[in-house]
Amino acid sequence: AGWNTGKEVTYKGSEATYHAYLSEDGKNAWIYLVETTNKTKSLKFPDTVEGAVVTRVGYDTALRKLEDADEFNQNISGVTVEYAHGVDGWSEKTINVESVVLPKNLTILESTALSGLRKVKSITIPDGVQKISAETFYGCKSLKEVKLPKSLASFDNYTSFSACPKLSKVTLSKENKSFKMQKGLLLNKKGTKLIWAVPAKNKITVPDSVTSIADNALKAGKATSVYLGKKVKMIGKDAIAGKKITKVSIAKKNKSIAKQG
């Protein structure tokens, strides 16, 4: 079903006002903008708006008028996010937001949706969300803990949690069919591909089960050293190009990668 973007509905919470569009059949709601003040400490998204179940959160460039087309997206506060220029969407209006509770039936969390919320320490992504998009949590500098959704099937490994230097604990249900977390590393379910590492990890030991490392896998973290396990054969583009990585060592039994400095 499409969305009726010609008519806006609102929900007034205790600390913020949530602006939404309803689906054409009136069953689902899409919250695309939240009005906050510098006194707002909590964003508790409603599960329903006017009887419609909230299934989508964030701003999408499709909402722009064509003449207003812009290469940049916005966060949930309507502030422009420009990753290429280091602009994470921080604003005075969200300066004190410390907690975010997303709608329980959420299925789509747009890119850049929660970027720039610099005081949020932990977040649980509802289990119905299948994709973590680019820059969704970019610049959440205090974020320490994230619970990934059970149905996660797609993950933007480079920018989703970029500029989240304190993020050290990421959990994922063992029932997830696509990925698994292992000692702070996000691997494919078989454990043969390293996709991402939690940003706060200083030393990364690539397990012996891993044969390939995804593009950009370790680019956004603060790791200073990387140890490549004995089965690593393929290293993707910029996979170990993190700015702070100064030491890369290779398992003695690894016959695929020649020792280079």
Regions found by a protein language model. Give the residues of each.
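Short beta-strand/loop segment at the start of cytosolic alpha/beta domains
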Residues: 2-35, 182-185, 189
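Structural signature of tandem-repeat unit edges
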Residues: 24-26, 38-55, 67-108, 118-131, ...
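Hydrophobic residues on conserved beta-strands that form the core of alpha/beta folds
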Residues: 31-33, 54-57
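Acidic, Ser/Thr
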Residues: 34-36, 60-67
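Core beta-strand segments of extracellular beta-sandwich domains
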Residues: 61, 159-161
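Short, aromatic/basic amphipathic alpha-helical patches
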Residues: 159, 258-261
